[in-house]
C-alpha cells in the first residue's frame, strides 16, 4: 500500500495576544496531527489542538537555537511524508522574517503540498497596542518593515541607509535591541535628525508588554536603563509623537505575570477577568477529558430517582449524550435537578430544565460527575453515582509552562478554590513551585482555604472580589515603589 503524503500549513500565530489568531489558523490547529511551534507563538493557541496532536518545540533565542533550521526542514518533510497533517506555527506572520521560504522550498523538493495562512505581524500590532498607528495622513504616508540582523558574522544589517533615512517616514525594525545603537548612528549619519522620536516595544500585545520612548540620540541609554531586551519592535519617525493614549499599557494589571491553578472541573471565570485587566496569564495544569463507558444499569432506572445532582457542566453534557446514545426518552427523567457550579446550572437551563437548590443526601439521589468528583463524594454520601468522564492532566503543556516561567518569573500564584489549592500542594513541584515558603517562591493567594494558608504561608481571602482587590492593590504598590 502506497502512503499518501500529508500536508503542511504554515500558520501565522500573530504577535502574542491569542485573540489575534485568524479563523483559518484556528481551523488548521484543530485539524493538525503534529504542530511545530516557535518561541513567540503563544502556547494558549495549542489548546485548539486535538488531544492526540503531537507538539514539537522549535524555539530560537538570540545566539541559542533549540533546533537548527535544517532540522526543522527535515522534520516537516518527515512528518508530511508519513501522511500527517502538519502545522508549522510561527510567531507573527510566517512570511515576515520567518524563514518560511526555506521551509517551503524543502517541502517543494519532496513534492509535499503546503498552504500559507497569514498572521498579524508584530511590526504593525505592537505599535498599535502602544497607541501608535504606523501610518497617519498628517505624519506618515509610508512605512517600512526591516530586519535588524543579517547573515553576516557581525550580524548588523546591510541596508540602503540613505534611502531609509530620506524616503520612508516610519521605520519599523524587528528584533533590533542588540543593534539599536548601530541603527541610530547609521540613520543620523545619513541625514535623520538626532531628535527624531523612537519607541521600543518589548513583548508587544502580550500582558508583559513594556515600552520606552526617546530619540535617535538617547534611546539606547533609555533602553539600557529600563532593561528592555528582545523580543522587541523599534519604531522610528514622527508618528511616535502621535501617541496620545497607550490604551493597552494603561490596563490595571499590565506587566503582571500571574498563574491561576486549575483543578479539572468547571473552571472559574477569574482567569478571563485577569486577562481582560491586562495580566500575562498562565493556567496550570492543562487538562484533557477521557469519557467513561455508558453505565446502562443506572440509565435504565433513571425514572426512579427523585434528585439528580451534577458536579460540572461537562457532567451535564456527557450524561445527556449517554441518554441519547441509549435512546432513552428524556421525559423519563422526572427528578429535581441541581448543580454544583454556575456553568452546570447554565447548561441545564439551556436544555430547558429548572434547576433547584441542592437536595440532602438520600437513596433516591443520583450524583453525576467526573471520576474525581464522584470518588470524593462517595466517602460521605449513600446515594447512587454515575461517572461520566475522567479529567487527566495533559502533559504536553508541562514543558512549555516550565519554559514560560523560567523566561518570565511569576509575580503571583492564584488558587480560586480548595480543589486548586490541593492541586498546587500535590503537583506544584512539577513546574518548580513548592508550596513551602522560600525566598524563590512567588506569593500564593487562595480563596477559602484558611488551613492551607496557615500551614504554607499562603494569603487567604474569602471572596473573589476580595481576591481581585488584593491583586490590584499589590500591583499598584509595586508600580509606586518602582516609580
UniProtKB/Swiss-Prot annotation:
Upregulation: Positively regulated by TnrA under nitrogen-limited conditions.
Catalytic activity: uroporphyrinogen III + 2 S-adenosyl-L-methionine = precorrin-2 + 2 S-adenosyl-L-homocysteine + H(+)
Catalytic EC class: transferase
The EC number(s) this enzyme carries: 2.1.1.107
GO term, biological process aspect, one: methylation
InterPro entries given in the database record: 4pyrrol_Mease (IPR000878), 4pyrrol_Methylase_sf (IPR035996), 4pyrrol_syn_uPrphyn_synt_sf (IPR036108), 4pyrrol_synth_uPrphyn_synth (IPR003754), 4pyrrole_Mease_sub1 (IPR014777), 4pyrrole_Mease_sub2 (IPR014776), CobA/CysG_C (IPR006366), Siro_Cobalamin_biosynth (IPR050161)
Keywords: Methyltransferase, Porphyrin biosynthesis, S-adenosyl-L-methionine, Transferase
GO molecular function annotation: uroporphyrin-III C-methyltransferase activity; uroporphyrinogen-III synthase activity
Origin superkingdom: Bacteria
PROSITE patterns the UniProt entry points to: SUMT_1, SUMT_2
Family: Belongs to the precorrin methyltransferase family.
Stated name of the protein: Uroporphyrinogen-III C-methyltransferase
UniProt organism field: Bacillus subtilis (strain 168)
Amino acid at each position: 500500500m502506497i502512503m499518501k503524503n500529508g500536508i503542511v500549513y504554515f500558520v501565522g500565530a500573530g504577535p502574542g495576544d491569542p485573540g489575534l489568531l485568524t479563523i483559518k489558523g484556528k481551523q488548521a490547529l484543530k485539524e493538525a496531527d503534529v504542530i511545530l511551534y516557535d518561541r513567540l507563538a503563544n502556547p494558549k493557541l495549542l489548546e485548539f489542538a486535538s488531544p492526540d496532536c503531537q507538539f514539537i518545540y522549535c524555539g530560537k533565542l538570540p545566539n541559542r537555537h533549540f533546533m537548527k533550521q535544517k532540522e526543522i526542514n527535515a522534520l516537516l518533510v518527515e512528518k508530511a511524508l508519513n501522511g500527517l497533517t502538519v502545522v508549522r506555527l510561527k510567531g507573527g506572520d510566517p512570511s515576515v522574517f520567518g524563514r518560511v521560504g526555506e521551509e517551503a522550498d524543502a517541502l517543494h523538493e519532496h513534492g509535499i503540498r503546503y498552504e500559507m495562512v497569514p498572521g498579524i505581524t508584530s511590526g504593525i500590532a505592537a505599535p498599535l497596542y502602544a497607541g501608535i498607528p504606523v501610518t497617519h495622513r498628517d505624519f506618515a504616508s509610508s512605512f517600512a518593515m526591516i530586519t535588524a540582523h543579517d547573515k553576516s558574522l557581525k550580524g548588523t544589517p546591510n541596508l540602503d541607509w540613505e534611502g531609509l533615512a530620506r524616503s520612508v517616514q516610519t521605520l519599523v525594525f524587528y528584533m533590533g535591541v542588540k543593534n539599536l545603537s548601530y541603527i541610530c548612528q547609521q540613520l543620523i549619519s545619513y541625514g535623520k535628525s538626532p531628535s527624531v522620536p523612537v519607541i521600543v516595544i518589548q513583548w508587544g500585545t502580550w500582558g508583559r508588554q513594556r515600552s520606552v520612548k526617546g530619540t535617535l540620540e538617547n534611546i539606547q541609554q533609555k533602553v539600557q536603563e529600563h532593561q528592555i531586551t528582545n523580543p522587541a519592535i523599534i519604531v522610528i519617525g514622527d508618528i511616535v509623537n502621535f501617541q496620545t493614549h497607550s490604551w493597552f499599557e494603561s490596563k490595571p494589571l499590565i506587566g503582571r505575570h500571574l498563574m491561576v491553578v486549575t483543578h479539572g472541573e468547571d473552571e472559574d471565570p477569574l482567569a478571563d477577568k485577569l486577562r481582560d485587566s491586562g495580566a500575562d496569564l498562565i493556567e496550570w495544569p492543562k487538562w484533557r477529558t477521557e469519557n467513561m463507558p455508558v453505565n446502562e444499569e443506572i440509565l435504565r432506572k433513571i425514572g426512579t430517582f427523585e434528585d439528580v445532582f451534577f458536579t460540572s457542566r461537562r457532567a451535564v453534557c456527557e450524561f445527556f449524550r449517554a441518554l441519547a446514545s441509549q435512546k432513552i426518552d428524556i421525559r423519563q427523567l422526572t427528578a429535581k435537578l441541581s448543580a454544583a457550579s454556575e456553568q452546570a446550572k447554565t447548561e441545564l437551563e439551556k436544555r430547558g430544565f429548572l434547576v433547584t437548590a441542592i437536595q440532602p443526601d438520600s437513596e433516591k439521589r443520583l450524583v453525576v460527575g467526573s471520576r474525581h468528583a464522584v470518588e470524593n463524594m462517595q466517602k460521605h454520601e449513600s446515594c447512587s453515582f454515575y461517572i461520566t468522564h475522567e479529567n487527566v492532566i495533559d502533559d504536553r503543556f508541562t514543558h512549555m509552562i516550565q519554559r514560560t516561567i523560567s523566561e518570565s518569573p511569576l509575580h503571583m500564584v492564584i488558587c480560586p478554590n480548595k480543589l486548586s489549592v490541593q492541586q498546587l500542594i500535590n503537583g506544584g513541584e512539577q513546574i518548580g513551585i513548592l508550596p513551602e515558603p522560600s525566598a524563590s517562591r512567588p506569593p500564593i493567594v487562595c480563596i477559602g482555604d484558611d488551613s492551607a494558608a496557615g500551614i504554607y504561608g499562603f494569603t487567604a481571602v474569602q471572596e473573589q472580589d476580595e481576591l481581585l482587590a488584593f491583586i490590584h492593590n499589590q500591583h499598584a504598590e509595586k508600580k509606586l515603589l518602582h516609580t
